[in-house]
């Protein structure tokens, strides 16, 4: 059983948010934290999600169907991009808040965090928001290949102390942690991956 990702639908406005009966795991993080690269690593494909060096490139809510497990990974717009207009930032903040609070199928928030950086206020705010609304967190440290082993361990401990959950260390380029992340995402969605099916293809 190979795991595959398919971009099934895209939403740009509140009205376009569709209700899917299947479980959903939201992917959120600061602009340029590496969400698109992580989606591609999970899919085992290089071009499923568009990757850009320009912060804030993802400006939509993208619903990726995970087969054959039948749940969605929902890629939310990156936040914290200072060059975006105030009205644009406000628009996406409202979209994010409505999705996180009104989607009955949402099972967890996968919060992407740059392994190289200290905890950022916007990340802390989103983690607190999720916890205040009873939304389970799956913290993910991205770009772990840029840090040495001591730095990785320190960052994991730091975030575990903050959110109460040890983050999954990942690297999209080396595929570090991708198999474990699939297990964590599936568990959060309420499904099980048998050992022979861990690798995304």
Swiss-Prot record:
CDD domains reported for this sequence: YihA_EngB (cd01876)
InterPro entries: G_ENGB_dom, GTP-bd, GTP-bd_ribosome_bio_YsxC, P-loop_NTPase
Positions contributing to GTP binding: 29-36, 56-60, 75-78, 142-145, 168-172
Coiled coil region boundaries: none
Keyword Cell cycle: yes
GO cellular component: cytosol
Chain ranges of the EngB-type G domain: 21-191
Keywords for this protein: Cell cycle, Cell division, GTP-binding, Magnesium, Metal-binding, Nucleotide-binding, Septation
Cofactor list: Mg(2+)
GO molecular function, one term: GTP binding
Classification via Pfam families: MMR_HSR1 (PF01926)
Disulfide bond keyword on record: no
Family membership noted in the UniProt record: Belongs to the TRAFAC class TrmE-Era-EngA-EngB-Septin-like GTPase superfamily. EngB GTPase family.
Described purpose of this protein according to its UniProt entry: Necessary for normal cell division and for the maintenance of normal septation.
Protein name: Probable GTP-binding protein EngB
Organism, as annotated: Desulfovibrio desulfuricans (strain ATCC 27774 / DSM 6949 / MB)
């Amino acid at each position: 059983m190979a795991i595959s990702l398919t971009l099934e639908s895209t939403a740009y406005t509140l009205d376009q948010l569709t209700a899917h009966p299947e479980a959903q795991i939201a992917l959120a993080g600061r602009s340029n934290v590496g969400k698109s690269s992580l989606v591609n690593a999970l899919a085992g494909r290089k071009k499923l999600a568009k990757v850009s060096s320009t912060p804030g490139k993802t400006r939509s809510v993208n619903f990726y169907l995970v087969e054959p497990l039948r749940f969605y990974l929902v890629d939310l717009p990156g936040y914290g991009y200072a060059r975006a207009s105030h009205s644009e930032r406000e628009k996406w903040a409202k979209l994010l808040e409505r999705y996180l609070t009104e989607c009955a199928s949402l099972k967890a928030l996968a919060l992407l965090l740059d392994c190289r950086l200290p905890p950022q206020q916007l990340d802390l705010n989103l983690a607190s928001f999720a916890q205040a609304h009873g939304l389970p967190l799956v913290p993910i440290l991205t770009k772990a290949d840029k840090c040495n082993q001591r730095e990785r361990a320190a960052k994991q401990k730091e975030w575990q102390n903050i959110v109460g959950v040890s983050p999954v260390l990942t690297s999209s380029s080396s595929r570090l942690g991708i198999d474990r992340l699939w297990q964590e995402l599936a568990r959060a969605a309420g499904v099980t991956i048998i050992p022979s099916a861990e690798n995304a293809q």
